[in-house]
Amino acid sequence: MGIKRETILILDFGGQYTQLIARRIREANVYCEIVPYDISPEEIKKIDPKGIVLSGGPASVYVKNAPKCDKEIFELGYPVLGICYGVQLMTELLGGKVAPAPVREYGKTEVVINNTIPLFKGIERDTIVWMSHTDQIELPPPDFKVVASTENCPIAAIANVEKKLYGVQFHPEVSHTHRGTEIIRNFLFEVCDCSADWTMDSLIEQTVKEVRAKVGNHKAVCALSGGVDSAVAAVLVDRAIHDQLVCIFVDTGLLRTNEGDMVIETFRKNYDMNIIRVDAKDRFLSRLKGVTDPEEKRKIIGNVFIEVFKEEAMKIGDVKFLVQGTLYPDVIESGHGISSTIKSHHNVGGLPEDIGFELIEPLRMLFKDEVRQVGKELGIPDEILYRQPFPGPGLAVRIVGEVTEEKLEILRLADSIVQREMKRFGWYNKVWQSFAILPGIKSVGVMGDERTYGYAIILRVVDSMDGMTADWTKLPYEILESISTSITNEVPGVNRVLYDITSKPPATIEWE
């Protein structure tokens, strides 16, 4: 949002760990931004960063059309740290030589470092690092010294201490590198002389000022879903403009048991906010009648949501701004770096820009963990801050096939049992998501002395850091047994429970 502060720039060459680099820097209370690798020297000078990091990437620097930054970047006087592909590119551009490695290194590797240089200050001479490379430096650039080596990689790090140009072949941002955090902190504080001024307090204060200046005397609306992002965005903007903000909670009829009541009660109890609750259950269900295609269901839900939201906003009058809980990974994914992929997020709170309002996105430079930190500072209750992610289209994407009131009731009850048992066993906050799915298949069963023909419920529990990839959770058998027994005993019409043991990829977390 245009906040002027000490900044580290991360040039993105498509590495799988680029966002992890950013998180490690932010954890040190230093602000950073991920930018396209082809950013111009002029743009960099305008930003005037404290330092620059060149990320890893899948390419080889010596092949045609390999992504390369402008060589002039190394002449601007800013400290630079190249990581993996980044150090190879630095080598290539500054007159050294990179070639395929005779022995490719993957995984934990012992490295011997020169700990007299600022980058490795306080690090043991022998330490463990995470390697993942198929190329290596054969000859460092002129005026660079070799400052680390492994058994198979004689040039594992290089440095031009005078010009503050450093490069490492390993990945300090990955937790498997034993002293990786210290190496990154050394770059920030020993090399770049950062002052650790990135705090949630300062962010809140600055954002409040900027929102006030932008909104002026106009009104803003926010689609409140009860999720973490919309909640933090709403409370933050409410702190800035209070009476000028109206939050609209659209009850789609596709929510979990008592979810609408819980959200409204939580906000009204803790905050003096303008909240409008719209009951649009019948409208959503009637439009979904007979629809079985998952993408069609999503589109219908999104369109109806926009219709309802816009109608309510028009009733308020003089609304100029729309508050959205966009996060930094969304900004990166829809950006221009080579690792970018344009994704259609299924968050129905993500309204299109052409809805007729100017956007306010107070969280757009934050990662999820930082959003929760801001929420903590704002006093948002834990039951909101630590809720598991829930898809925008709600239970509609957890019912395979047509959505009906009967199926919604079955799924709500089954899902409430999953949440109850996960909390009872102390596992709710240990996993990324835990929920029930109604796949629309029926099977034969026996209850008492009678044959039954009932629905199956699928249990889905996954571990993840960010939802981009996920592993199925190895739940203890006693929890699985308790969930299964409770569902088949308490949910009418269900006689079987299955456990989905597929990771993402190849599957997605949600079924539709």
Swiss-Prot record:
Keywords attached to this entry: ATP-binding, Glutamine amidotransferase, GMP biosynthesis, Ligase, Nucleotide-binding, Purine biosynthesis
Domain Glutamine amidotransferase type-1: 7-197
EC number: 6.3.5.2
Name of protein: GMP synthase [glutamine-hydrolyzing]
Gene coding for it: guaA
HAMAP family to which the protein is assigned, alphabetical: GMP_synthase
Upper classification of the organism: Bacteria, Bacillati, Bacillota, Clostridia, Thermoanaerobacterales
Annotated pathway: Purine metabolism; GMP biosynthesis; GMP from XMP (L-Gln route): step 1/1
The organism of origin for this protein: Caldanaerobacter subterraneus subsp. tengcongensis (strain DSM 15242 / JCM 11007 / NBRC 100824 / MB4) (Thermoanaerobacter tengcongensis)
Ligase is among the record's keywords: yes
Location of the GMPS ATP-PPase domain: 198-387
Cellular component per GO, a single term: cytosol
